[in-house]
């Protein structure tokens, strides 16, 4: 398929600037692939679509405050430094994006507020990308504490309002455990302890994996021929305990629901020769677009995505292109909220 086939007009007012007042009360569109029907529910109704022995696969990555603001030495110019990934914990070496990039060259030093933290630019990686070394004597734990203090919740740019204290909590799933994401796995944001408890009482199991979400999901696709698009790599881990419960559910013909595109990408990057989930750890740059034969999950929970985004393409691959086109037209007509803080879709 071609990039232009994933184009649609998204009204600006449907891009959610705040989350729903209560996590589990966002609107939920339920799409049945077998019947082609579309239902309108709220998220807490999700319990009605799952039974004993079904599995929800959740991404337990934890967002860290990746957006820093520093000042360039001598000029004092304000520079945004967005932490992408740690390259060397001992040396405090990081891959970052800087803005404005034209002002930042190798050898420049950046000073971060009253924290006494200083960083030196050691390499150019892309037009906005730099490798920087934080000149810090302490260990990783101490360094993390400083970043937690001076960093800002990395809300996506399409949320055009100042960061609020509530974002620290709301831009994080309640099951976040393993720090390393610079964007939230947003389908998971709708879960509350109450919803999870009710599902567990019903016999639904939650199986964790970790995929540290990078900025790749926000990167625009700029080639019409999708086979030429290259995804950014993201680090993931699937433990044997998760593989075992997922495979048992598959053997018993139960529902295996990927909570979000990140969980789905990790699952599809860990398929054994006999189409079962295997324990795995590493990096994945898997790009899923139609047509695609999904091997593990037979159900998917995902927010409403940007036109021409790799996330929308994955939803189309899973739900079927025609049905998803219809669903998105319906979502716009019914004024569903889109993107990270928006409403959610359950594809069964």
From Swiss-Prot:
The organism's taxonomic lineage, starting at the top: Bacteria, Pseudomonadati, Bacteroidota, Cytophagia, Cytophagales
Protein family membership: Belongs to the QueA family.
Keywords assigned by UniProt, alphabetized: Cytoplasm, Queuosine biosynthesis, S-adenosyl-L-methionine, Transferase
Pathway participation: tRNA modification; tRNA-queuosine biosynthesis
GO cellular component, as recorded: cytoplasm
Subunit structure: Monomer.
Cystine residue pairs: none
Subcellular location: Cytoplasm
Record bears the keyword NADP: no
EC number in record: 2.4.99.17
Major subcellular site: cytoplasm
NCBIfam families: PRK00147.1, queA
Biological processes, Gene Ontology terms: queuosine biosynthetic process; tRNA wobble guanine modification
Reaction catalyzed: 7-aminomethyl-7-carbaguanosine(34) in tRNA + S-adenosyl-L-methionine = epoxyqueuosine(34) in tRNA + adenine + L-methionine + 2 H(+)
This protein's name: S-adenosylmethionine:tRNA ribosyltransferase-isomerase
Enzyme class: transferase
Lineage: superkingdom: Bacteria
Family matches, as InterPro entries: QueA, QueA_dom1, QueA_dom2, QueA_sf
